[in-house]
A protein has these predicted regions:
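Zinc-dependent deaminase catalytic domain
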Residues: 1-515
Length: 515
């Protein structure tokens, strides 16, 4: 009962405490996402990375005459019809508990092969988190590279076992080859899922609804449906459950037995596994809904004089939203009892790479926390409600942007476009660091811009020059950009308005049914 025992150990570990990246013994007043669950959620989310232009064009050509969207991010991530058996897969590469790579399958390469190309021998002793169990072709190469551990989501594998009967035999043979590679390799190939700590889902729901992006919509569109967030979340839940879960229990058991997890097919292990998976999907859908594809909202430059120039350099909105959700997930590892902040840095190379992320590649990420190696009682945890400024936390917390820069896995190249996504407006302490590091663009909320609070101020962000700032707001040009129209409508990141005579949002599938 090796796998079942492993699940028991993980459950007891998850129920006890969450091991922190920064301070290993931190047990705060708020529920906290474990590292294992964070990496797992990020791998699932990377599977949904918006498809690059070539994939978008092909899928649109197959639609022949159907204008408008193929759906939200998750719809764009579906594999082409001639490759249904090979599922798109997300991958998180972790070294010494730090994320050093975020990848997803491309049209030509699986996620494991992309990791090998990108990291090479540096994969030695790394932990890899896949959104699906990798195929034998990928596994033999990453095992050969000397990885430490390979974790995967225990549902339909990369070579789908849910495909047509004509191809199921090949899928079963591949699954057997994977098991032989697993049993004869030094790498630990396993399922790492921890139950969420008590009240975690409730906490994520409350904080997602109260986050800057949702509240900005609620304040600027008072006539909007007050329940738009709940409707958006319910749609996401349905879509993600279809993509990442196996609804039929017997079919799920068949898959588990085929991929070597027969010990998890007995209760209570099977029911616990399915519940843990469902809880994580609910959490992912909740966080993803906090940066919604809603009406004309997105990340735009507020300066109307620079709009045309800035748009020529901006990311497509679907990619900007995806990266911001990455940062939102990171924020749930915070060590700040009052507010969690997450930050992620990406860069865009001169040409498209083999990765499913296109020309974009991961630089680093972080969240606000106390210095590495410190214990829970080493520093004050009081906020500005404490009158004695000496025992407040603000002098000791390392900000999310600072951690992302400190623990970056690649250098920032001045000739490339590097961008940082932050869940809150960067403060006066971080703004000069971001500019000094050579980051070209900032994507953030602007709720706190120009404010000066008791221990922290946000005055410099509005005055910042030389760095493009894209904040969450209504499209200031007054034109709704049709994100899923013909491929020419978004070329090299250029957002172009539709012809005036064309119906805005034609066949548009929003997160909301009505708006």
């Amino acid at each position: 009962m090796k796998e079942a025992g492993q699940m028991q150990n993980l459950e007891s570990a998850g129920a006890g405490r969450s091991v922190s990246t920064q301070t290993g013994s931190m047990t705060g007043q708020i529920p906290r996402l474990s590292k294992v669950n964070l990496f797992t959620l990020l791998s699932l989310w990377m599977e949904l990375f918006p498809a690059v232009k070539a994939q978008r064009q092909k899928s649109q050509e197959k639609e022949e005459g159907k204008h408008g969207p193929l759906g939200d991010n998750e719809e764009m991530a579906r594999t082409s019809t001639d490759k249904k058996q090979v599922k798109r897969t997300g991958l998180v590469v972790v070294k010494n508990t730090k994320i050093v790579g975020l990848h997803c399958s491309s049209e030509d390469l699986h996620a494991g092969k992309i990791a090998l190309i990108k990291h090479g021998s540096r994969l030695k002793n790394c932990d890899l988190y896949f959104s699906r169990k990798p195929c034998s072709a990928c596994l033999k190469m990453i095992v050969n590279a000397g990885v430490n551990r390979i974790s995967y989501w225990p549902a339909d594998p990369e070579i789908s076992l849910l495909a047509e009967a004509s191809s199921s035999e090949d899928a079963k043979l591949d699954a057997k080859a994977v098991e032989r590679l697993k049993s004869n390799s030094r790498a630990h190939v396993c399922v790492l899922l921890q139950p969420l700590v008590c009240y975690m889902v409730q906490f994520v729901e409350e904080t997602s609804y109260k986050c800057d992006f949702i509240q900005k919509i609620a304040k600027t569109l008072p006539d909007a449906n007050v329940d738009f967030y709940s409707e958006c979340k319910q749609e996401r839940i349905k879509e993600y459950e279809m993509l990442f879960l196996v609804s039929n229990e017997e079919m799920h058991k068949q898959i588990l037995m085929t991929i070597g997890l027969e010990n998890l097919c007995e209760n209570p292990y099977f029911s616990n596994l399915r519940q843990n998976m469902k809880d994580l999907i609910l959490l992912l859908a909740t966080v993803a809904s906090s940066v919604p594809n809603f009406k004309h909202y997105g990340f735009y430059c507020g300066n109307t004089e620079q709009i045309n120039e800035i748009h020529n350099q901006s990311l497509p909105q679907e990619i900007a939203r995806h990266c911001m959700v990455q940062a939102r997930l990171l924020a749930y590892r915070t060590e700040d009892h009052k507010i969690g902040v997450g930050a992620v840095i990406w860069a865009e190379g001169k040409s498209r790479s083999c990765d499913g992320t296109g020309a974009m590649y991961f630089i680093g990420c972080g969240y606000n926390a106390f210095p590495v190696g410190s214990e829970y009682a080493d520093f004050p945890h009081m906020d500005d409600k404490q009158k004695d400024r000496e025992i407040r936390k603000f002098r000791y917390i390392v900000h999310a942007e600072q951690n992302a820069l400190t623990f970056r896995c690649q250098e920032i190249k001045p000739e490339e476009r590097t961008m940082i996504f932050v869940t809150k407006c960067p403060c006066d302490e971080c703004v000069p660091l971001i500019k000094g590091a050579g980051i070209k663009q900032i994507y953030a909320g602007d709720v706190d811009v120009g404010k000066k609070k008791a221990d922290i101020s946000y005055m410099r962000f509005g005055e910042l020059e030389g760095v493009s700032k894209f904040t969450w707001q209504l499209n200031p040009s007054g034109t709704c950009v049709h994100e899923h129209n013909e491929p020419e409508s978004k070329e090299n990141g250029v957002l172009r308005p539709l012809p005036s005579g064309e119906e805005q949002h034609q066949n548009k599938k929003l997160c909301l049914g009505n708006h």
